[in-house]
Amino acid sequence: MEEPQKNDLSMREQEEEHPVRSSGPQISVSEFSCHCCYDTLVNPTTLNCGHSFCRHCLALWWMSSKKTECPECREKWEGFPKVNILLRDAIEKLFPDAIRMRVEDIQQNNDVVQSLAAFQKYGNDQNPLAPSTGRVNPQRGGGFFSGVLTALTGVAVILLVYHWRSRESEHGLLVHKAVDKWTMEEVVLWLEQLGPWASLYRDRFLSERVNGRLLLTLTEEEFSRAPYTIENSSHRRVILTELERVRALGVKPPQNLWEYKAVNPGRSLFLLYALKSSPRLGLLYLYLFDYTDCFLPFIHTICPLQENSSGEDIFTKLLDLREPTWKQWREFLVKYSFLPYQLIAEFAWDWLEVHYWTSRFLIVNAVLLSVLELFSFWRIWSRSELKTVPQRMWSHFWKVSTQGLFMAMFWPLIPQFVCNCLFYWALYFNPIINIDLVVKEVRRLETQVL
């Protein structure tokens, strides 16, 4: 009786040491091998098609192919693949020594570690919701947000269609018509565009039947006495200054966004994208290559010389060609260094009376771009990547310069319709895209905190 008991004990010990072998058919390591590296599965990740691979093998495959499909059957996966916990635990219990050696080798390979980090970051971008929220109904939160974006897109489309159909033809604008061919109504239109105060003198110009030819002959003395009687010296100076510009150019100089776009379609498109993607380089370009026409009016608008100049007319600031003072330069350089998009928002704020909706789109877009820039700086700081800032700056400078050079080279070949589409897209639809980007950054930040 003692010998059978001893045999039973020895068999139980063997079963405890080799549980797989004692259960009938033996299981080999090859049955738990990855079909990419043909080695034991480490952190096995099962795809929708049912195939399982090492997680680092899947990351390397994704990095090299940039495709979200199975390396074996090429079926696309949905969502973001996760580690098969049950299969992982079973393999670690069956082959602990092999798994431990493989994990050590993987951790020592920098390329594999970087691929895993990039793959996980891609997954976080695909699933930005915080884990603590559980499985939130996507139709509840996402549906509301998509509804807001749809409404904003609809407003942008309506505004674009209204503007495109209601505004004058670009060929009919005064910026394209010689002064000596202006009619009485066009002279009055030119006068009213100088500012709200110019409406005081509208009837006087109409009663004298002032057309383009007569306008060119008027002098300061004639403006100061009857029948014009412009007693306000500031008003008279603005009219004379603008009249000198008209005489020098032969046409009306642009005084709003649409007239500037009609006269300078290429420059307006270039400046819009430059100030959107790289405001610091865009303002530097204005300082170096467009100092008198663009930079001086810009700095006098956002950094006025007098503190009580808030009531000053916007067109008066545009005609101010005096050199900025040191106080203006200090204010400008501080904002230029830390909040460049605020400069654009302040400039658009002064144009609210002229461009009601367009200025608001620009202001909102400037705020969103400032928030995205702050998120970028925070990401660099939190990841201790300050050493990469010079390289990032050089890459950004090279990218913007290359795009500007490419546009300058191929500008004559680009159809005007395409340029208009790009212009209106950046003006009205880019803020809607940036709203979505800001929401994603906020959700990603919540995920990292939680």
Curated annotation (Swiss-Prot):
Chain positions covered by the region annotation Disordered: 1-25
Q: Name all SAM domain ranges.
A: 182-249
Q: What is this entry's stated membrane topology? A: Multi-pass membrane protein
List the SMART domains hit by this protein, alphabetically: RING (SM00184), SAM (SM00454)
Catalytic activity entry: S-ubiquitinyl-[E2 ubiquitin-conjugating enzyme]-L-cysteine + [acceptor protein]-L-lysine = [E2 ubiquitin-conjugating enzyme]-L-cysteine + N(6)-ubiquitinyl-[acceptor protein]-L-lysine
> In which domain of life is the source organism classified?
Eukaryota
The entry's localization annotation reads: Endoplasmic reticulum membrane
Q: Which GO terms describe its biological process?
A: apoptotic process; negative regulation of apoptotic process
Sorted alphabetically, which InterPro entries does this protein's record hold? SAM (IPR001660), SAM/pointed_sf (IPR013761), Znf_RING (IPR001841), Znf_RING/FYVE/PHD (IPR013083), Znf_RING_CS (IPR017907)
A GO CC term assigned to this protein in UniProt: endoplasmic reticulum membrane
Topological domain (Cytoplasmic) residues are 1-140, 353-360, 426-450
Description of post-translational modifications: Mediates RING-dependent self-ubiquitination leading to proteasomal degradation.
Glycan-modified residues: N232, N308
Matches recorded under PANTHER family: BIFUNCTIONAL APOPTOSIS REGULATOR
Q: How does it assemble?
A: Interacts with CASP8, BCL2 and BCL2L1 through SAM domain and also with HIP1, IFT57, ESRRBL1 and BCAP31. Interacts with NGFR; this interaction inhibits NF-kappa-B and JNK-related signaling pathways.
Stated role:
Membrane-bound E3 ubiquitin ligase that plays a role in several processes including apoptosis regulation or reticulum endoplasmic stress. Has anti-apoptotic activity, both for apoptosis triggered via death-receptors and via mitochondrial factors. Contributes to the dynamic control of IRE1/ERN1 signaling during ER stress by inducing BAX inhibitor 1/TMBIM6 proteasomal degradation. Promotes the activation of TGF-beta signaling by mediating the 'Lys-63'-linked ubiquitination of TGFBR1 which is critical to activate the pathway.
What is this protein's name? Answer: Bifunctional apoptosis regulator
Give the gene that encodes this protein.
Answer: Bfar
